[in-house]
């Protein structure tokens, strides 16, 4: 995805984003300190909606399975225009969110798709995480690429009103196998947009987005997404 399209995506996502423990007894060891978060807000895949201004007319995502065990299947076929999905994070979670967890599996990798190489910016699966501070949007795009070094950060695009980094979360690997991901939201934001300052201010988490594409490589691309939750 080129820089111009990435900026358009930011604008599109912006539209979407407008019990106690018993006391230990004398014979029992003390309880461990509580975790920094104790709640888990599940996000059904059916909650994701098309980001109209960044999407073509043909929908290629489909919710599969019963409501209590569903996943989102995505299959891009050229020459379709790409379609991006997004959702608003509930107001109550925007400052309280600590971690994001999800599962995904690549089914068809888009050839040599590599978000870090110009002209080959396609991925079997992408998860966008969006924060907003004042008038500025901050985005980290986690991708499952067909090629490239796992863990690499690239396509850093920072301006007055928008900033986006791409992180190659997975690259290549076996297709058809579910992988669970968990990211520390505040640590990720500080690493990318606060120079690693552990006390850097973190703005509201306002949105999430999904994308499976193969338009630059002109290659079929497919993946499944499931198990989204925000821990707080």
PLM regions and their residue ranges:
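Extracellular carbohydrate-recognition regions
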Residues: 24-54
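Short carbohydrate-recognition loop motifs
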Residues: 61-82
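Extracellular/lumenal carbohydrate-interaction signature centered on repeated Trp-anchored short motifs
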Residues: 87-100, 172-175, 201
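Solvent-exposed strand-to-loop "edge" motifs in beta-rich extracellular domains
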Residues: 103-109, 132, 186
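Beta-strand acidic-aromatic groove motif in beta-rich domains, primarily in extracellular
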Residues: 110-129, 137-139
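Extracellular beta-strand ligand-recognition surfaces/modules
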Residues: 119-127, 171, 175-220
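Extracellular carbohydrate recognition and processing domains
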Residues: 138-195
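Extracellular beta-strand elements of beta-rich domains used
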Residues: 208, 223-230
């Amino acid at each position: 995805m080129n820089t111009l399209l990435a900026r358009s995506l930011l604008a599109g996502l912006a539209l979407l984003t407008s019990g106690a423990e018993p006391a230990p007894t004398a014979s029992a060891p003390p309880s461990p300190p509580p975790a920094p978060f104790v709640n888990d807000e599940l996000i059904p895949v059916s909650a994701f909606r098309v980001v109209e201004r960044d999407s073509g007319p043909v929908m290629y995502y489909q919710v599969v399975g019963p409501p209590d065990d569903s996943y989102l299947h995505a299959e891009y076929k050229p020459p379709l225009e790409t379609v991006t999905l997004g959702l608003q994070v509930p107001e109550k979670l925007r400052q309280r969110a600590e971690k994001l967890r999800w599962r995904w599996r690549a089914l068809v990798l888009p050839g040599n798709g590599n978000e870090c190489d110009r002209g080959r910016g396609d991925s079997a699966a992408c998860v966008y995480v969006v924060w907003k501070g004042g008038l500025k949007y901050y985005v980290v795009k986690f991708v499952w690429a067909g090629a490239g070094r796992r863990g690499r950060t690239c396509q850093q695009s920072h301006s007055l009103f928008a900033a986006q980094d791409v992180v190659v979360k997975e690259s290549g690997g076996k297709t058809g196998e579910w992988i669970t991901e968990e990211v520390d939201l505040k640590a990720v934001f500080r690493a990318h947009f606060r120079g690693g300052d552990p006390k850097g201010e973190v703005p509201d988490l306002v949105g999430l987005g999904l994308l499976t594409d193969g338009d630059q490589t002109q290659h079929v691309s497919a993946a499944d997404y499931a198990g989204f939750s925000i821990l707080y």
